[in-house]
Amino acid sequence: MSATVTVVVRTRNRPAMLTRALASIASQTFDDYEVVIVNDAGDEAEVREIVKKQKSAVRSKITIVTNEVSKGREAALESGLSASHNRYYAVHDDDDSWHPHFLKKTVAYLDEHPQAGGVATRCEIIRERVRADGTCIEIEREVLSTDNYGLSLVDMMVENYTPPISQLIRREVADRVGHWDGSLQTQADWDFNLRLLADSPVGFVDGEPLAYWHHRDTMDASLGNSVVTDAYLHKWDNLHIRDRYLRTMLATEDPSSPHLGQALLSAEYYRRMREELARVDSGFHSSLNLVHVDMLNTMTALHQQVHELREEVTSLRAELASVSQIKRSVRSAASKSKRAAKKLMGRG
Protein backbone atom coordinates (compact mmCIF):
# COMPACT_ATOMS: atom_id res chain seq x y z
CA MET A 1 0.00 0.00 0.00
CA SER A 2 1.36 3.43 -0.94
CA ALA A 3 -0.08 6.87 -0.27
CA THR A 4 0.97 10.45 0.42
CA VAL A 5 0.31 10.31 4.17
CA THR A 6 0.69 7.68 6.86
CA VAL A 7 -1.68 8.17 9.79
CA VAL A 8 -0.53 6.29 12.89
CA VAL A 9 -3.21 5.58 15.49
CA ARG A 10 -1.98 4.31 18.85
CA THR A 11 -4.63 2.48 20.88
CA ARG A 12 -5.15 0.00 23.67
CA ASN A 13 -8.55 -1.28 24.79
CA ARG A 14 -10.49 1.93 24.15
CA PRO A 15 -13.03 0.83 21.53
CA ALA A 16 -15.33 3.86 21.76
CA MET A 17 -12.41 6.25 21.33
CA LEU A 18 -10.89 4.25 18.49
CA THR A 19 -14.26 4.32 16.72
CA ARG A 20 -14.36 8.12 17.07
CA ALA A 21 -10.77 8.47 15.83
CA LEU A 22 -11.46 6.41 12.70
CA ALA A 23 -14.55 8.52 12.02
CA SER A 24 -12.38 11.64 12.29
CA ILE A 25 -9.89 10.24 9.78
CA ALA A 26 -12.64 9.01 7.44
CA SER A 27 -14.11 12.54 7.35
CA GLN A 28 -10.98 14.02 5.74
CA THR A 29 -11.50 15.81 2.44
CA PHE A 30 -7.98 14.70 1.45
CA ASP A 31 -8.11 10.93 1.07
CA ASP A 32 -4.68 9.86 -0.22
CA TYR A 33 -3.64 8.33 3.08
CA GLU A 34 -3.19 5.00 4.78
CA VAL A 35 -3.90 4.23 8.42
CA VAL A 36 -1.71 2.09 10.66
CA ILE A 37 -3.46 1.16 13.89
CA VAL A 38 -0.91 0.19 16.53
CA ASN A 39 -2.72 -2.05 19.00
CA ASP A 40 -0.31 -1.93 21.93
CA ALA A 41 -1.07 -5.29 23.58
CA GLY A 42 -4.80 -4.65 23.59
CA ASP A 43 -7.67 -6.88 22.47
CA GLU A 44 -6.91 -7.47 18.78
CA ALA A 45 -10.29 -9.07 18.05
CA GLU A 46 -11.99 -5.92 19.33
CA VAL A 47 -9.86 -3.73 17.06
CA ARG A 48 -10.58 -5.92 14.05
CA GLU A 49 -14.31 -5.80 14.78
CA ILE A 50 -14.20 -1.98 14.82
CA VAL A 51 -12.28 -1.92 11.54
CA LYS A 52 -14.75 -4.36 9.99
CA LYS A 53 -17.55 -1.85 10.65
CA GLN A 54 -15.85 0.88 8.60
CA LYS A 55 -16.92 1.63 5.04
CA SER A 56 -14.96 -0.38 2.49
CA ALA A 57 -13.21 2.74 1.13
CA VAL A 58 -11.78 3.41 4.60
CA ARG A 59 -11.30 -0.22 5.60
CA SER A 60 -9.05 -0.82 2.59
CA LYS A 61 -6.67 1.88 3.85
CA ILE A 62 -6.19 0.33 7.31
CA THR A 63 -3.36 -1.90 8.51
CA ILE A 64 -3.37 -3.30 12.05
CA VAL A 65 -0.09 -3.84 13.89
CA THR A 66 -0.40 -5.61 17.23
CA ASN A 67 2.34 -5.55 19.86
CA GLU A 68 2.00 -8.79 21.81
CA VAL A 69 3.75 -7.11 24.73
CA SER A 70 3.05 -3.45 25.41
CA LYS A 71 5.87 -1.17 24.31
CA GLY A 72 4.33 1.89 25.96
CA ARG A 73 2.88 5.05 24.42
CA GLU A 74 6.08 6.55 23.09
CA ALA A 75 7.65 3.39 21.65
CA ALA A 76 4.37 2.31 20.06
CA LEU A 77 4.73 5.01 17.40
CA GLU A 78 7.80 3.28 15.98
CA SER A 79 5.74 0.14 15.35
CA GLY A 80 3.49 2.22 13.12
CA LEU A 81 6.28 4.02 11.29
CA SER A 82 8.06 0.72 10.64
CA ALA A 83 4.94 -0.55 8.85
CA SER A 84 4.60 2.40 6.48
CA HIS A 85 7.04 4.69 4.63
CA ASN A 86 5.10 7.47 2.93
CA ARG A 87 6.15 11.05 2.20
CA TYR A 88 4.39 12.51 5.24
CA TYR A 89 3.06 11.11 8.48
CA ALA A 90 0.75 12.19 11.29
CA VAL A 91 0.10 10.83 14.78
CA HIS A 92 -3.65 10.59 15.39
CA ASP A 93 -4.09 8.95 18.78
CA ASP A 94 -7.35 7.14 19.48
CA ASP A 95 -8.60 9.86 21.84
CA ASP A 96 -8.09 12.89 19.56
CA SER A 97 -9.76 14.18 16.40
CA TRP A 98 -9.36 16.41 13.33
CA HIS A 99 -11.31 19.00 11.41
CA PRO A 100 -12.22 17.54 7.97
CA HIS A 101 -9.73 19.89 6.24
CA PHE A 102 -6.72 19.04 8.44
CA LEU A 103 -4.91 16.81 5.94
CA LYS A 104 -5.94 18.90 2.94
CA LYS A 105 -4.39 22.08 4.35
CA THR A 106 -1.30 20.56 5.96
CA VAL A 107 -0.40 18.45 2.91
CA ALA A 108 -0.81 21.53 0.69
CA TYR A 109 1.52 23.48 2.97
CA LEU A 110 4.30 20.88 2.91
CA ASP A 111 3.93 20.45 -0.86
CA GLU A 112 4.36 24.22 -1.28
CA HIS A 113 7.22 24.53 1.26
CA PRO A 114 9.76 21.76 0.55
CA GLN A 115 12.22 23.25 3.05
CA ALA A 116 9.82 22.70 5.96
CA GLY A 117 10.37 19.62 8.10
CA GLY A 118 6.77 19.69 9.22
CA VAL A 119 3.72 21.85 9.76
CA ALA A 120 1.31 22.43 12.63
CA THR A 121 -2.15 23.93 12.82
CA ARG A 122 -4.04 25.95 15.36
CA CYS A 123 -5.32 23.48 17.98
CA GLU A 124 -8.32 23.40 20.28
CA ILE A 125 -8.46 21.62 23.64
CA ILE A 126 -11.74 19.78 24.17
CA ARG A 127 -12.47 18.92 27.78
CA GLU A 128 -14.82 15.99 28.16
CA ARG A 129 -16.24 13.47 30.60
CA VAL A 130 -16.30 9.71 30.01
CA ARG A 131 -19.63 7.90 30.23
CA ALA A 132 -19.94 4.39 31.64
CA ASP A 133 -19.96 2.94 28.10
CA GLY A 134 -16.64 4.63 27.24
CA THR A 135 -18.13 7.35 25.03
CA CYS A 136 -17.50 10.98 25.92
CA ILE A 137 -19.55 14.09 26.66
CA GLU A 138 -18.01 17.42 25.69
CA ILE A 139 -17.86 19.94 28.54
CA GLU A 140 -16.02 22.92 27.06
CA ARG A 141 -13.48 24.05 24.45
CA GLU A 142 -10.46 26.32 24.59
CA VAL A 143 -8.04 27.35 21.85
CA LEU A 144 -4.49 26.31 22.76
CA SER A 145 -1.60 28.80 22.88
CA THR A 146 -3.49 31.76 21.45
CA ASP A 147 -0.40 33.97 21.82
CA ASN A 148 1.68 31.78 19.47
CA TYR A 149 1.55 32.31 15.72
CA GLY A 150 4.16 29.79 14.64
CA LEU A 151 6.69 27.23 15.85
CA SER A 152 10.18 28.28 16.90
CA LEU A 153 13.07 26.45 18.53
CA VAL A 154 13.35 29.28 21.07
CA ASP A 155 9.78 28.79 22.29
CA MET A 156 9.97 25.00 22.05
CA MET A 157 12.99 24.99 24.38
CA VAL A 158 10.76 26.51 27.07
CA GLU A 159 7.86 24.08 26.69
CA ASN A 160 6.03 21.90 24.19
CA TYR A 161 3.00 23.87 23.02
CA THR A 162 2.18 21.78 19.95
CA PRO A 163 0.55 18.35 20.52
CA PRO A 164 1.09 15.56 17.96
CA ILE A 165 -2.53 15.69 16.74
CA SER A 166 -1.86 19.15 15.28
CA GLN A 167 1.24 18.17 13.26
CA LEU A 168 2.08 16.67 9.87
CA ILE A 169 5.74 15.59 9.56
CA ARG A 170 7.95 15.14 6.51
CA ARG A 171 9.20 11.55 6.79
CA GLU A 172 12.67 12.05 5.30
CA VAL A 173 13.41 14.78 7.86
CA ALA A 174 12.17 12.60 10.73
CA ASP A 175 14.40 9.77 9.50
CA ARG A 176 17.34 12.17 9.46
CA VAL A 177 16.89 13.66 12.96
CA GLY A 178 15.64 10.45 14.56
CA HIS A 179 12.17 9.34 15.57
CA TRP A 180 10.56 9.45 19.00
CA ASP A 181 12.70 8.11 21.87
CA GLY A 182 10.83 5.00 22.98
CA SER A 183 12.77 4.81 26.24
CA LEU A 184 10.81 7.80 27.51
CA GLN A 185 7.42 7.29 29.15
CA THR A 186 6.24 10.80 28.23
CA GLN A 187 7.59 13.92 26.46
CA ALA A 188 9.01 11.98 23.49
CA ASP A 189 7.06 14.31 21.18
CA TRP A 190 8.73 17.35 22.77
CA ASP A 191 12.17 15.76 22.46
CA PHE A 192 11.44 15.05 18.79
CA ASN A 193 10.18 18.59 18.19
CA LEU A 194 13.45 19.99 19.58
CA ARG A 195 15.48 17.91 17.12
CA LEU A 196 13.09 18.67 14.27
CA LEU A 197 13.26 22.44 14.81
CA ALA A 198 17.04 22.31 15.27
CA ASP A 199 17.23 20.79 11.79
CA SER A 200 14.47 22.50 9.78
CA PRO A 201 11.82 25.22 9.96
CA VAL A 202 8.32 24.02 10.81
CA GLY A 203 5.34 25.78 9.26
CA PHE A 204 2.09 26.87 10.86
CA VAL A 205 -1.46 27.01 9.48
CA ASP A 206 -3.24 29.71 11.48
CA GLY A 207 -6.94 30.51 11.60
CA GLU A 208 -9.69 28.10 12.52
CA PRO A 209 -8.44 25.22 14.72
CA LEU A 210 -7.99 22.10 12.58
CA ALA A 211 -6.86 19.77 15.38
CA TYR A 212 -8.72 18.80 18.53
CA TRP A 213 -6.76 17.65 21.57
CA HIS A 214 -9.16 15.86 23.91
CA HIS A 215 -8.64 16.01 27.68
CA ARG A 216 -10.48 13.99 30.29
CA ASP A 217 -10.21 15.01 33.94
CA THR A 218 -9.86 11.49 35.31
CA MET A 219 -7.03 9.67 37.05
CA ASP A 220 -8.03 6.39 35.35
CA ALA A 221 -4.93 5.82 33.20
CA SER A 222 -6.85 3.64 30.75
CA LEU A 223 -9.26 6.47 29.87
CA GLY A 224 -7.45 9.67 30.84
CA ASN A 225 -5.08 11.94 28.96
CA SER A 226 -1.44 11.45 30.00
CA VAL A 227 -1.08 15.18 30.72
CA VAL A 228 -3.54 14.59 33.59
CA THR A 229 -2.87 11.00 34.66
CA ASP A 230 0.94 11.15 34.37
CA ALA A 231 1.62 14.77 35.30
CA TYR A 232 4.55 13.83 37.54
CA LEU A 233 6.15 11.78 34.72
CA HIS A 234 5.84 14.73 32.35
CA LYS A 235 7.78 16.84 34.85
CA TRP A 236 10.59 14.35 35.42
CA ASP A 237 10.92 13.27 31.78
CA ASN A 238 11.19 16.95 30.87
CA LEU A 239 14.11 17.33 33.29
CA HIS A 240 15.65 14.07 32.05
CA ILE A 241 15.63 15.34 28.46
CA ARG A 242 17.19 18.66 29.48
CA ASP A 243 19.87 16.84 31.50
CA ARG A 244 20.67 14.57 28.56
CA TYR A 245 21.21 17.47 26.16
CA LEU A 246 23.30 19.33 28.74
CA ARG A 247 25.50 16.28 29.33
CA THR A 248 25.94 15.84 25.58
CA MET A 249 27.04 19.46 25.28
CA LEU A 250 29.55 19.08 28.10
CA ALA A 251 30.79 15.57 27.22
CA THR A 252 33.57 16.77 24.94
CA GLU A 253 34.53 19.67 27.19
CA ASP A 254 37.19 19.95 29.86
CA PRO A 255 35.62 19.80 33.35
CA SER A 256 36.59 23.44 33.79
CA SER A 257 34.90 24.42 30.51
CA PRO A 258 33.18 27.82 30.54
CA HIS A 259 30.10 26.15 29.02
CA LEU A 260 29.32 24.51 32.37
CA GLY A 261 29.82 27.85 34.07
CA GLN A 262 27.43 29.50 31.63
CA ALA A 263 24.83 26.80 32.23
CA LEU A 264 25.21 27.16 36.00
CA LEU A 265 24.93 30.93 35.71
CA SER A 266 21.69 30.58 33.74
CA ALA A 267 20.38 28.14 36.34
CA GLU A 268 21.26 30.57 39.15
CA TYR A 269 19.46 33.45 37.45
CA TYR A 270 16.49 31.18 36.90
CA ARG A 271 16.52 30.26 40.61
CA ARG A 272 16.62 33.93 41.62
CA MET A 273 13.84 34.81 39.20
CA ARG A 274 11.70 32.00 40.60
CA GLU A 275 12.30 33.23 44.16
CA GLU A 276 11.43 36.80 43.15
CA LEU A 277 8.23 35.61 41.48
CA ALA A 278 7.35 33.67 44.62
CA ARG A 279 8.00 36.81 46.72
CA VAL A 280 5.85 38.95 44.42
CA ASP A 281 3.15 36.30 44.41
CA SER A 282 3.21 36.14 48.21
CA GLY A 283 3.01 39.94 48.44
CA PHE A 284 0.16 39.99 45.97
CA HIS A 285 -1.80 37.44 47.96
CA SER A 286 -1.12 39.34 51.20
CA SER A 287 -2.38 42.54 49.60
CA LEU A 288 -5.35 40.67 48.22
CA ASN A 289 -6.15 39.36 51.70
CA LEU A 290 -5.98 42.90 53.12
CA VAL A 291 -8.31 44.13 50.40
CA HIS A 292 -10.61 41.21 51.13
CA VAL A 293 -10.69 42.04 54.86
CA ASP A 294 -11.31 45.72 54.09
CA MET A 295 -14.15 44.81 51.75
CA LEU A 296 -15.67 42.53 54.39
CA ASN A 297 -15.52 45.34 56.96
CA THR A 298 -17.09 47.75 54.49
CA MET A 299 -19.81 45.25 53.61
CA THR A 300 -20.51 44.62 57.31
CA ALA A 301 -20.85 48.36 57.94
CA LEU A 302 -23.13 48.72 54.92
CA HIS A 303 -25.28 45.82 56.08
CA GLN A 304 -25.58 47.49 59.49
CA GLN A 305 -26.58 50.79 57.87
CA VAL A 306 -29.15 49.02 55.71
CA HIS A 307 -30.53 47.29 58.81
CA GLU A 308 -30.82 50.62 60.63
CA LEU A 309 -32.49 52.23 57.60
CA ARG A 310 -34.99 49.38 57.46
CA GLU A 311 -35.83 49.93 61.12
CA GLU A 312 -36.28 53.67 60.49
CA VAL A 313 -38.52 52.97 57.49
CA THR A 314 -40.60 50.55 59.59
CA SER A 315 -40.91 53.19 62.32
CA LEU A 316 -41.89 55.87 59.80
CA ARG A 317 -44.49 53.57 58.28
CA ALA A 318 -45.97 53.00 61.75
CA GLU A 319 -46.04 56.74 62.41
CA LEU A 320 -47.64 57.40 59.02
CA ALA A 321 -50.24 54.74 59.73
CA SER A 322 -50.98 56.41 63.07
CA VAL A 323 -51.26 59.84 61.45
CA SER A 324 -53.55 58.40 58.78
CA GLN A 325 -55.76 56.90 61.47
CA ILE A 326 -55.93 60.24 63.29
CA LYS A 327 -56.84 61.98 60.03
CA ARG A 328 -59.63 59.49 59.42
CA SER A 329 -60.91 59.98 62.97
CA VAL A 330 -60.83 63.78 62.63
CA ARG A 331 -62.64 63.60 59.29
CA SER A 332 -65.26 61.29 60.77
CA ALA A 333 -65.78 63.60 63.75
CA ALA A 334 -65.99 66.64 61.52
CA SER A 335 -68.54 64.91 59.34
CA LYS A 336 -70.67 64.01 62.34
CA SER A 337 -70.45 67.59 63.64
CA LYS A 338 -71.62 68.95 60.31
CA ARG A 339 -74.58 66.60 60.24
CA ALA A 340 -75.53 67.52 63.81
CA ALA A 341 -75.28 71.23 63.06
CA LYS A 342 -77.56 70.84 60.04
CA LYS A 343 -80.15 69.07 62.14
CA LEU A 344 -80.10 71.80 64.78
CA MET A 345 -80.47 74.52 62.17
CA GLY A 346 -83.38 72.67 60.61
CA ARG A 347 -85.31 72.58 63.91
CA GLY A 348 -84.83 76.23 64.46
Protein language model regions, located:
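Nucleotide-sugar donor-binding/catalytic module of glycosyltransferases
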Residues: 1-240
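Boundary detector for helix-to-coil junctions that initiate low-complexity/charged tails
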Residues: 242-348
